[in-house]
Every structure is written in structure tokens, then in C-alpha cells.
Regions:
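Peripheral terminal and linker regions in Fe-S/redox and tRNA-modifying enzymes
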Residues: 1-335
């Protein structure tokens, strides 16, 4: 298990957050500033938001001894990027009513809305909730939005594979009701009744990204994800998924310990039950072995390299309770 002597500051904030609640309710009631408390700024990411300010106005406002012009960015959780017409119309309404008026489509198949003032954040979430949209775990040290190359309308096969994005997203959601209590005014039933077997009270050491693709198309860059599922198709039927672990292309300038890495294809699972179990337990390994001291070295790729691919696969098999088959042949010819 991970044995770093000194935990990073965010680790202490997470464990003391009471299930990602922190003092968010109190921060929202503070009308003196458009910001929220410093520790809440870390926690609000797990709710799918970032606190931002207008950099172009910093000097002007400082000269007038005014606070920065703070606002929030909200990123929705949309597994596989599929929205209904009603949901898109709601996003258009929210963008016009509460934001800069711009809807940004991200590379991970979701949307972001910027410029939301503090007193408009709750109405934003309440509008989205009416059409079954939320921003839970769209940011933060958790599984992020699940990307999938498949368009469900292309064929029944594509539809069945696209459904994995939603299943995985639901499987890996935090169990805390904090989002519903803070933004949707859900009443808290009792103290200390929540348990989260996956994230516990520490969550993950860093963000975790999952992509699903159907060869020969690789438009989600599946090997650039912390975990990738590569659909294996034979005679027009889904036989299972190759599992790729440890991808990530980001590096930190001037830090030679950081590096880009393509995911390693470590094995194959032939049933939905086994695939979902392997995905889940991959996260538990990252939770337990990931670096919680240095966030620059905390992604899955560093965990995999520190453990070694063979040791990682053995640990995954141990946690899953079944052997991981060897990878099946596949080929990418287009993106």
C-alpha cells in the first residue's frame, strides 16, 4: 500500500470534508464575497465546479479596492456525450439566463458553462436536475466523465457498447449525498450513515479518466486514458473488452519525473460482470497504491510503473477473484 510520509494538503481536506460537504452551505450564505472558502474551493471540484475570476479585470478592480470578480464554471456529467433534445434546450436556457451565454463542448464529450455567479449556482443545478442532468464527479479526484467512441444510433452493437459508459459512470459515482444537500436542498436524514466502499473518505489520489472504443476507430484516444476498454468484435458480436491501464499524455514542465505514457493493454474480460468488476477494482488499486504525497506523480500511469505491469495484473486478479485473460488481437486504422 501507499506509504508516503507526508500527505499533500488536499488529502487532509478530503478526509475532513464529511463526505465532500465541507462548509459549502456556509460559504454560499456569505454575501460579502463572490468566492467561497479556500478549503471549499478544493471540495467544490468534486461537485463538478471550479471557482474562477475575470483576469482581465483584476488590476482595475484591485485599484478600486474591489474583490476579484468571481464566478463558477460548471461541467456536466454526460457519459458517452449523449443528451436528449430536452436536456440541450435546458442547457441553452441556463446558458442564456445564468452564464456568459456560451456553451463549451469538451474533448471528453460533455459541456461546460462559465461565468456563473455564486447566487446563480443553485438555480443552475436545479434547472439541470429537472432534466436528469448533474455535474457530480465531473471534476476532482474521482472517476471523471466516461468517454465512448460509439454512437448508439449507429447499430444495436454500438448501442450496447455505448451503454457501458453509463453503467461505468453510475458504478463509480461517489456515494455521498453532499451534492443533493448543498445544491438541491435535499434534507439530510441522519449523521454518519454514509459508507463508500470505493472512495472511502480519501477518494482517489488524482483524477481518473476512462475511455471506451470500438476498433478500428480510436477517436477517444483510448490509450491516453487511465483506463481504456477496447471492444473486441467477432462476427458482428461483442466478445468482451481488452483492458488498457496507465495512459496519460500530460507532463509538468521542468519536472523530469513526469512523463507521457500510452496505456498498457494488460488483458481481456469476456462478460459484462467481469468487465465492470475489473474496472471497479482497478480504481481500488489506484486508491490504495497511488501517490498521495506528490500530486504531480499521482496518476494511474505512475502507480502502474511503480508496481510493474505483472504485479499490477496479479493484484487485479486477486481483487477480482478471477483470472484476467490475455489480450485479444485488434487494430486501429482511424481516429
Amino acid at each position: 500500500m501507499s506509504k508516503q510520509e507526508k500527505l499533500s494538503a488536499i488529502e487532509h481536506i478530503k478526509t475532513a470534508s464529511h463526505g465532500l460537504r465541507g462548509t459549502l452551505k456556509e460559504s454560499l450564505q456569505d454575501e460579502i464575497t463572490g468566492a467561497i472558502r479556500e478549503q471549499d474551493q478544493a471540495l467544490v471540484k468534486f461537485h463538478g465546479m471550479y471557482l474562477q475570476d475575470d483576469r482581465d479585470l483584476r488590476e482595475e478592480r484591485a485599484a478600486k479596492k474591489l474583490d476579484k470578480l468571481y464566478s463558477f464554471m460548471v461541467r456536466l456529467r454526460i457519459p458517452g456525450g449523449l443528451m436528449t433534445p430536452e436536456q440541450w434546450i435546458t442547457a441553452h436556457h441556463v446558458a442564456g439566463e445564468y452564464t456568459t451565454g456560451v456553451i463549451k463542448i469538451t474533448t471528453r464529450q460533455t459541456i461546460q458553462l462559465h461565468g456563473i455567479l455564486k447566487n446563480h449556482v443553485k438555480p443552475t443545478h436545479q434547472n439541470f436536475s429537472k432534466v436528469k442532468l448533474d455535474s457530480i464527479a465531473a471534476c476532482g479526484d474521482v472517476n471523471r466523465n466516461v468517454a465512448c467512441t460509439s454512437h448508439p444510433a449507429e447499430s444495436l452493437l454500438h448501442k450496447s457498447i455505448h451503454a457501458y459508459a453509463d453503467r461505468i459512470s453510475r458504478l463509480l459515482l461517489p456515494k455521498t449525498r453532499a451534492f443533493y444537500e448543498v445544491w438541491l436542498d435535499e434534507e439530510k436524514i441522519a449523521e454518519n450513515t454514509e459508507t463508500d466502499p470505493l472512495y472511502q473518505d480519501r477518494y482517489l489520489p488524482r483524477k481518473f479518466k476512462i475511455g471506451i472504443c470500438i476498433p478500428p476507430n480510436n477517436d477517444v484516444d483510448v490509450l491516453a486514458n487511465d483506463l481504456g476498454l477496447i471492444a473486441i468484435i467477432e462476427d458482428g458480436k461483442l466478445k468482451g473488452f481488452n483492458i488498457a491501464v496507465g495512459g496519460g499524455l500530460s507532463t509538468t514542465h521542468g519536472n523530469a519525473d513526469t512523463y507521457a505514457r500510452l496505456a498498457t493493454v494488460i488483458g481481456f474480460t469476456d462478460t459484462e460482470e467481469k468487465t465492470l468488476k475489473a474496472v471497479y477494482e482497478t480504481l481500488t488499486i489506484q486508491r490504495d497504491y497511488g501517490n498521495r504525497s506528490d500530486r504531480k506523480l499521482a496518476r494511474m500511469k505512475y502507480t502502474l510503473d511503480n508496481m510493474g505491469v505483472d504485479a499490477f495484473r496479479k493484484e487485479l486478479e486477486k481483487r477480482c477473484g478471477f483470472p484476467i485473460e490475455d489480450p485479444k488481437p485488434y487494430e486501429f486504422t482511424q481516429r
